[in-house]
Amino acid sequence: MALISTRRTLSTLLNKTLSSSTSYSSSFPTLSSRSRFAMPLIEKVSSSRTSLGPCYISTRPKTSGSGYSPLNDPSPNWSNRPPKETILLDGCDYEHWLIVMEFTDPKPTEEEMINSYVKTLTSVLGCEEEAKKKIYSVCTSTYTGFGALISEELSCKVKALPGVLWVLPDSYLDVPNKDYGGDLYVEGKVIPRPQYRFTEQRHTRPRPRPRYDRRRETMQVERREPSMGLHSPVNPGEFNKPSA
């Protein structure tokens, strides 16, 4: 129970940190997708904490109730799902899954990435056409992954596939509209949505042009001639004359 409480606290802090780092601009909703990765960060924090030294926590296996998930159960009971009150992010229903993949250099094209997404899901469903129907979103810019409407049991099988980095319960990027974000994927066709794409070129502000003072460019320089009447040239020899 202590570990569960710690993970909840860490999740809350991570969500606040990730959301605050993106609140400066509402025009880039893709940045809020970082909150999706709070759960694997919790796992990394937990694993790094236990590797620093002995940490003994009295626990017992659970098959239901708060804090239980078949994802962490070696012998899962798929009929027992965690209560929705324990879900931290809106949209997490353990039916919509975010599958994040990693690609080696040289980085493949967008089309090659999407084909890889379909191939990955096909390997567990056994049918390419069925896989195309189950994929509801794809992304090749902000992150490399896709959203799939599959069971929790199948999500565990996907997690074991090569090239799969994370498999997480998906969450809304646009909570009021219940939108998971990314480019839509409908029957094998990609429907681009620029508002969910984030690139360095888009994020970088253009450098301001140098400013010039037009008044200085158009102002005529007045050259003043020396006045002959006011100041007469001085003969150096006059300073050497003896005084009378």
UniProtKB/Swiss-Prot annotation:
Its cellular-component GO annotations read: mitochondrion
Ranges of Basic and acidic residues compositional bias? 210-226
Where are the residues of the annotated region Disordered? 59-82, 196-244
Q: Where in the cell is it found?
A: Mitochondrion
Q: Which UniProt keywords apply?
A: Mitochondrion, mRNA processing, Transit peptide
- Transit peptide range per the UniProt entry: 1-62
- Main location class: mitochondrion
Read off the InterPro entries from this record: MORF/ORRM1/DAG-like (IPR039206), MORF/ORRM1/DAG-like_MORF (IPR054059), S8pro/Inhibitor_I9_sf (IPR037045)
Q: Which GO terms describe its biological process?
A: cytidine to uridine editing; mitochondrial mRNA modification; mitochondrial RNA modification; mRNA processing
Knockout phenotype, as recorded, reads: Retarded growth.
Membership in a protein family: Belongs to the MORF family.
Q: What does this protein do?
A: Involved in organellar RNA editing. Required for the processing of RNA editing sites in mitochondria.
How it assembles, according to the record, is: Heterodimer with MORF1. Homodimer and heterodimers with MORF8/RIP1, MORF4/RIP4 and MORF5/RIP5.
Name of this chain's protein: Multiple organellar RNA editing factor 3, mitochondrial
Q: What is the lineage of its organism?
A: Eukaryota, Viridiplantae, Streptophyta, Embryophyta, Tracheophyta
